[in-house]
From Swiss-Prot:
Cell wall formation. Catalyzes the addition of glutamate to the nucleotide precursor UDP-N-acetylmuramoyl-L-alanine (UMA). Its EC number is 6.3.2.9. It catalyses: UDP-N-acetyl-alpha-D-muramoyl-L-alanine + D-glutamate + ATP = UDP-N-acetyl-alpha-D-muramoyl-L-alanyl-D-glutamate + ADP + phosphate + H(+). Pathway: Cell wall biogenesis; peptidoglycan biosynthesis. This is UDP-N-acetylmuramoylalanine--D-glutamate ligase. ATP binds at residues 112-118. The lineage of its organism: Bacteria, Pseudomonadati, Pseudomonadota, Gammaproteobacteria, Legionellales. Keywords: ATP-binding, Cell cycle, Cell division, Cell shape, Cell wall biogenesis/degradation, Cytoplasm, Ligase, Nucleotide-binding, Peptidoglycan synthesis. Belongs to the MurCDEF family. GO terms for molecular function: ATP binding; UDP-N-acetylmuramoylalanine-D-glutamate ligase activity.
Length: 447
């Protein structure tokens, strides 16, 4: 007889998917959320009318019976309920761990501060083109456990994983795993770069092959590659045999593996040096998982990129407008400024600001001084950004994103690009980064 009692910690999309998974497996469970108005509460109560739900507090007599806590990645590991459950002897893990225990199909695992969604989607498209039944999931789109049902049988899982998800995962053994890059982010949760990097490094555990960024020391595996683990790297320089990089020949830049030129960068639709790195990483991951080079390159030539990630909006009076609302941290914005600024004649007018998540905006000074004409600031941490950058370029303030678009139009000259890449989270003014990007795009289309 099974006496296990599961606690689902955190509602929302992930919590609902965990509850459905437990119900399918005939497990007893209760639910907890720190919020009084938990997202998805009405839907949960409609679907699970008999399951106890505790908001803001869980009684000790319940905690003492709990054997397993499956928590949403949004809940910090030092949340009191999780601490109490841990002290009472419960196992604590996340939905990716549940998936890892259930599936036998190979997994490609992808993390990194920036570029995860682009690379994950790109690898998924390459696998589809090669005829794989592929599940693209994790920190992107549908929660993994909603894809784990009797109707779907996948040949391959391509998982985008956040540092929070990796903190809660122990049994994943990917066919290939990568950390694309590591720059300061989520330091409000992880507190130090060391802890954040350590969380990312968990992705390599149990992997048959690892792909790292040879220009980013934080991505290099901490455990040196053992004989039975294949180590592959990518970077902007010319690659050594078996690795991936860029080769310059006769004024043309090529994506390359070893000495083999694969494709001129002009042939791919996603623009900027940072996107060339994303393309190289996707190629390396797909090939390591057994996808043919023909399918890989065909997809690269037609993949248009993802919304809100260095997405071209339009040109007005000789000025280009680019929506990079997904630039929610400094590293993403540095990549966007360097990637776009390094491939154009004019200057960038940068729209930035929002919730800075404890970041040090001084790190923007170097790329801003090289490529940016002026900055228009919005949002909660505008003061911090202004004090870090006001001596580098002219800084203007706007009370709304629509106002920032109007101001940016007057600052830009023909040949320039206006780039929305906020280097901040969006929740001070918007529902999420998608909403912020939609408001920007709509304002630009109205010019």
């Amino acid at each position: 007889m099974n006496h296990s009692l599961y606690l689902v910690a955190g509602l929302g999309k992930t919590g609902l998917s965990i509850a459905r998974y437990l119900k399918r497996n005939n497990k007893s469970f209760v639910v907890f959320d720190t919020r009084k108005e938990a997202p998805g509460l009405a839907e949960f109560q409609n679907e699970f009318p008999d399951v106890p739900i505790y908001l803001q507090q869980t009684p000790d007599e319940v905690i003492s019976q709990v054997t397993d806590v499956i928590t949403s990645p949004g809940l910090a590991l030092d949340t009191p309920v999780l601490e109490r459950a841990r002290q009472a002897g419960a196992s604590i893990y996340g939905d990716i761990e549940c998936l890892a225990r259930e599936i036998s199909a190979p997994v490609i695992a992808i993390t990194g501060t920036n570029g995860k969604s682009t690379v994950t989607t790109l690898v998924g498209e390459m696998a589809k083109a090669a005829g794989f039944r592929v599940a693209v999931a994790g920190n992107i789109g549908t929660p993994v456990l909603d894809m784990l049902d009797d109707e779907h049988h996948y040949d391959l899982w391509v998982l985008e994983l956040s540092s929070f998800q990796l903190d809660l995962t122990y049994s994943l053994s990917p066919v290939v795993a990568t950390i694309l890059n590591v720059t300061p982010d989520h330091l409000d949760r992880h507190h130090t770069m060391e802890a954040y990097t350590q969380a990312k490094q968990r992705i390599y555990r149990g992997a048959k092959a690892v792909l790292f960024n040879r220009e980013d020391v934080y991505t290099v595996p901490h455990q040196s590659c053992q004989a039975d683990i294949k180590c592959i790297s990518f970077g902007k320089d010319a690659p050594s045999m078996g690795n991936w990089g860029l080769i310059e020949q006769e004024n043309t830049t090529y994506l390359a593996k070893g000495m083999e030129r694969l494709l001129p960068v002009e042939s791919i639709l996603i623009k900027g040096v940072h996107n060339w790195m994303n393309a190289l990483a996707a190629c390396a991951l797909a090939e390591a998982a057994g996808i043919s080079m023909q399918h890989i390159l065909n997809v690269l030539k037609t993949f248009p990129g993802l919304p809100h990630r260095c997405q071209w909006v339009r040109e007005v009076d000789g000025v280009g407008w680019i929506n990079d609302s997904k630039g929610t941290n400094i590293g993403a914005t540095i990549s966007a400024i360097n990637g776009i600024g390094g491939s154009m004649q004019g200057k960038i007018v940068l729209i930035a600001g929002g919730q800075g998540k404890g970041a040090d905006f001084q790190e923007l000074a170097q790329p801003v001084s090289e490529f940016v004409r002026s900055i228009v600031l919005i949002g909660e941490d505008a003061d911090k950004i202004e004090s870090a950058l006001a001596k580098v370029v002219p800084v203007v303030r706007a009370s709304s994103l629509e106002g920032a678009v109007t101001i940016a139009k007057t600052c830009a000259k023909p040949g320039d690009v206006v780039l929305l890449s906020p280097a901040c989270a969006s929740l001070d003014m918007f529902r999420d980064f998608n909403h912020r990007g939609d408001v920007f795009t709509s304002s630009v289309r109205g010019l």
